[in-house]
């Protein structure tokens, strides 16, 4: 059973525990700048929203990489950067429509969420349950896709 990160924005307090846990898990240091998850602050509303790679089914980053450094981890469903293969060309950062792949100056490589090998530190660290790691079927995405197919909800130009 595939699992996904599920974010409930209304529960986020902006404590940054997710960013700290991520940076510690991946770099052994508490540095939000090194985190693969970010908390966006909507200053005009006071809302905080965590965001990270959505592990797209049709991952543009994976297809765009000229050296095939981004591959699918079949166990977790995550699209993972192989740092030994990555040449730091940043094509994947341009291809990602969500801006969740970042270039790391220190290494000359890119980084993105890899779901921590199936045990995301951000979800474990979130004190409010704003970030959870749940069965993909629970999100209802499959049912929404089935309804869209049945209804033929294709965009049309008027």
Please name every model-derived segment:
Residues 4-9:
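Local sequence-structure signature of Cys/Sec-based thiol-disulfide redox active-site neighborhoods
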Residues 10-30, 35-42:
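A positional/architectural concept
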């Amino acid at each position: 059973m595939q699992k996904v990160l599920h974010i409930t924005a209304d529960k986020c307090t902006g404590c940054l525990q997710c960013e700290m846990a991520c940076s510690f898990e991946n770099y052994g240091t508490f540095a939000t700048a090194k985190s693969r998850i970010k908390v966006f602050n909507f200053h005009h509303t006071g809302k905080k929203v965590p965001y990270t790679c959505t592990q797209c089914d049709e991952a543009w980053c994976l297809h765009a990489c000229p050296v095939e450094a981004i591959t699918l981890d079949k166990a977790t469903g995550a699209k993972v950067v192989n740092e030994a293969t990555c040449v730091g060309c940043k094509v994947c950062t341009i291809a990602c429509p969500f801006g969740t792949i970042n270039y790391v100056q220190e290494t000359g490589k890119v980084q993105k969420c890899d779901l921590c090998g199936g045990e995301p530190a951000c979800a474990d660290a979130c004190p409010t349950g704003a970030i959870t790691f749940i069965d993909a079927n629970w999100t209802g995405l499959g049912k929404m896709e089935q309804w869209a197919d049945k209804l033929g909800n294709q965009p049309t130009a008027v």
